[in-house]
Amino acid sequence: EERLLISKRLGGHPLALQLYQPEFDLPEQSVNVQRYVEDTVLSNLGKQEKDSLNLLSMEPIPIMSENSLVSDSIGIFDEQALLKWSSDNLNVEVQHLIRNVRRSFLDLNQQKQLHQKLSEHWHNISRSVQEDMILLFHQISSGNVNMVELIEEQLISISTNKSNFLAVLIEQALELRPESSDLHYFAAKVAAHRCELSILKHHIGNIEEERKSELNLQLAYLEGRTEDAERIFSQNMNHKDPHTVNKMAISAASRRIDDRIFDQNIDEELIADVRKYLSKIDISKLNKEVKSAALIAITVIKHSLALLESDINAAEKFSLSVGELGLEAESLMLILRSKQQIFRLKNNEISIEETIQFIDNAVSSQTNLIYSDSIRLNLVEALIPFDIKLANEQFKLLRKPEDDIKSNTYYRYVARWWLCKSYFSPSEKLTCLRESISVHKTAGCTRAAKILESRLHSFV
């Protein structure tokens, strides 16, 4: 295991492995390795080019070559075989052996100066979500005095892709400010989003009392303590901070909608609970910074509620209102409209062919793979009761669950995926049901898990 780690840090380079001296704490600090890199590998580079290489070596992940601060030097580095390219030849990074050696030459102050230059660069260009995280990495690494506020800005909307970066970056910030209640609060929020119970519990213990309410609610859901969750919700409805009340009400309503299975009869208790949670939301007191995201979340909940109550006209109005919130909401509007199409299919208002065509178009328009798979999974669930063969054909178009993706949204998708698979694989039915139950519990969907446990026991 130690040899593998050393090999990884030296980029797997055979000569570097031979030159490695075990008396050094880090492989790249070996004098022989450093001399080899400087005197042989980088012998054709001048000081300015080495300075540019240092900047590229400080990037945390492969980046788009044209967006690099040192894009003018990429060609030179490539000719010298100093770079490692992604399979599509778009993203680039410095070969790991060279990167680690260049970093080892820099003291902490020099590294901070480079991070500062890079943060200024990334701040001044148009960025993707991933590049937002690169910017945040450099801002934290340069010791930016506003790092708490900068992290908070990124927490307004936590996507699955962002949560991976944020979890790491917040821990990095905590190494610099371990006593920061704000940072522990942010870490707990991301852990709740990723359904990471042990991490959530750890950080809750380091948060100021008045900010614990919403996180204790999330913890109760994730641990399957629905009665405790309801008690926590009721106790906090008179919270002095209306923003906290709004967040808890939106979260409770959304979870109640999601905590069910597709072939379950809609009961009045579910509808009454969702209406109760929605009634606690005061839109006039939504924080300006999160108002847009909160309005979208509320509209999505109301859209789901309208379909549960078979009010297709209301559902259409809600999907149109989401579309009016800007370009970023267009993909979400397609998701809502696809649910309306499926509703019409189940009520014999449109044909299967029309529905599949609409779903195919909606899926192809999505850039988020979780969204696209969720759209098709909705169709699979609708087809199972009356055309199991066609449902299976659509199911085969879905990606299999991936272990490295962590978010409550994705876990709910995976739980539904396993439930659907139980219908198509009779010999694996019990295994699929057990997996669906387990993932439903991970996502905090206790009611759905209990229903499936009853089914499992009846089969056994």
Language model feature labels by segment:
Residues 9-21:
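The conserved phosphate-sensing helix
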Residues 35-105, 112-120:
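C-terminal boundary/linker of central alpha/beta nucleotide-binding cores
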Residues 1-2:
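Conserved small helical "lid"/interfacial subdomain of P-loop NTPases
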Residues 115, 149-152, 164-174, 196-207, ...:
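Alpha-helical repeat scaffolds
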Residues 134, 186-189, 214-218, 222, ...:
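"A position-specific structural signal for the A-helix of alpha-solenoid helical repeats
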